[in-house]
Amino acid sequence: MTATPAPRGPAPGAAPKISFVSLGCPKALVDSERILTHLRAEGYELARRHDGADVVIVNTCGFLDSAKAESLSAIGEAMAENGRVIVTGCMGAQPEEIREKYPDLLAVTGPQAYESVVAAVHEAVPPAHDPFLDLVPPQGIKLTPRHYAYLKISEGCSNRCSFCIIPSLRGNLVSRPAADVLREAEKLVKAGVKELLVVSQDTSAYGVDIRYSESPWRDRQVRAKFYDLTRELGELGAWVRLHYVYPYPHVDEVIPLMAEGKVLPYLDMPLQHASPSVLKRMRRPGNQERQLDRIRSWRQTCPDLAIRSTFIVGFPGETEAEFEELLAWLQEAKLDRVGCFEYEPVAGATANALGDPVPPAVKAERKRRFMETQNGIALRLQRAKVGKRLPVIVDSVEGGVARGRSKADAPEIDGTVHAAFRRPVRVGDIVTVKIDRAEAYDLYGSVA
């Protein structure tokens, strides 16, 4: 058994240093930012390398086996390069597997355990005696580029989808008061953030748990309700992008805000399947025929609306006929952005008891057919943009080409707009790009 690394600390007069690894979804990234903001306020500095830090924090993901493997690999790297490691995040909610492989970790905590992580850091390497609070900018420490930021409006989820263990990891829905969310958003915009990406486990359920209670914002009371919060965010002067929106009827209310230009005409809506029988086994809401009618209505109100969704193929018991239902629905819906995942069992999920697994080769073939169908849809939609002038937020500039995203593209998961330019263009600028060429995911053109 390896001996626990001896306590160490910064050189006399130097600030203690933290190295940080953040894995998983945008909600986990927000958790990481909160921890770093707290530690930075206490005088800790951020190290670029594990071997230059006094302690390493790894924020893990534990949703899928592949995510667990990535988390364990990251922990292993931190142990090898530093040896003084604190683990937190979703995988930490079930610490036995982590401790079995890495018994000498300083601490293992679950998700949202901010105070426990900070306490473990204090024990490993105490903060400076006189921390300078002005080390932290008003908007906090962000791990995203300066021009966009994730805005988490709630924790947890009260749905009980059979393939998901998020409620057991993060608990039931807990919404933030609207005024708290808006104050954070305002600080971000004042700090130069051009795009706010609203995230949670179930964005459209925001406020249900606190009965849509009001809180004071500026000169008025604002309800903790999906529409009300979206409307107020739309007044801050930044792009506002809505993620993880379930297709509830009250989502209809925000579409006019998109048509008016208050928020981006973009909905990230994880539908997961279209066959009623599969959705029933998944314990998912939604009549898919009704969803088609709703999507048509949304597009009539807001013709520029881009809809992103994710789907699972190979769910236990999925027949060829049920998969064909999904393909037919996809062709009818004509969604702009789509991701597809082969079903992967998750320890603790009730779907594991369904039996009748789909063979791996069949799952892979269905994913191929699904994406082939979607790529054809996406290419037709993209080609319709050729000749148009689109606003694009610039993410990078290199070699006379700016790469960014249109209003239809979220960072990391959607397409890229590649634009040649002659006048100066900087990261974070919002420029107009004339589109000359289209692929299924990316667009090409020049800055107008």
Curated annotation (Swiss-Prot):
Entry's Gene Ontology BP terms: tRNA modification
GO molecular function list: 4 iron, 4 sulfur cluster binding; aspartic acid methylthiotransferase activity; metal ion binding; protein methylthiotransferase activity
Gene3D superfamilies linked to this entry: Methylthiotransferase, N-terminal domain, Nucleic acid-binding proteins, tm_1862 like domain
Residue sites binding [4Fe-4S] cluster 1 per the record: 25, 61, 90
Residues that coordinate or bind [4Fe-4S] cluster 2: 157, 161, 164
Source domain of life: Bacteria
Co-factor remark: Binds 2 [4Fe-4S] clusters. One cluster is coordinated with 3 cysteines and an exchangeable S-adenosyl-L-methionine.
GO cellular component, one term: cytosol
Compartment(s) of residence: Cytoplasm
InterPro entries reported for this sequence: Elp3/MiaA/NifB-like_rSAM, Methylthiotransferase, Methylthiotransferase_CS, Methylthiotransferase_N, Methylthiotransferase_N_sf, NA-bd_OB-fold, Ribosomal_uS12_MeSTrfase_RimO, rSAM
Span of domain MTTase N-terminal: 16-126
Stretches assigned to the Radical SAM core domain: 143-380
Necessary cofactors: [4Fe-4S] cluster
Described function: Catalyzes the methylthiolation of an aspartic acid residue of ribosomal protein uS12.
Family: Belongs to the methylthiotransferase family. RimO subfamily.
Protein name, per record: Ribosomal protein uS12 methylthiotransferase RimO
Organism expressing this protein natively: Methylobacterium radiotolerans (strain ATCC 27329 / DSM 1819 / JCM 2831 / NBRC 15690 / NCIMB 10815 / 0-1)
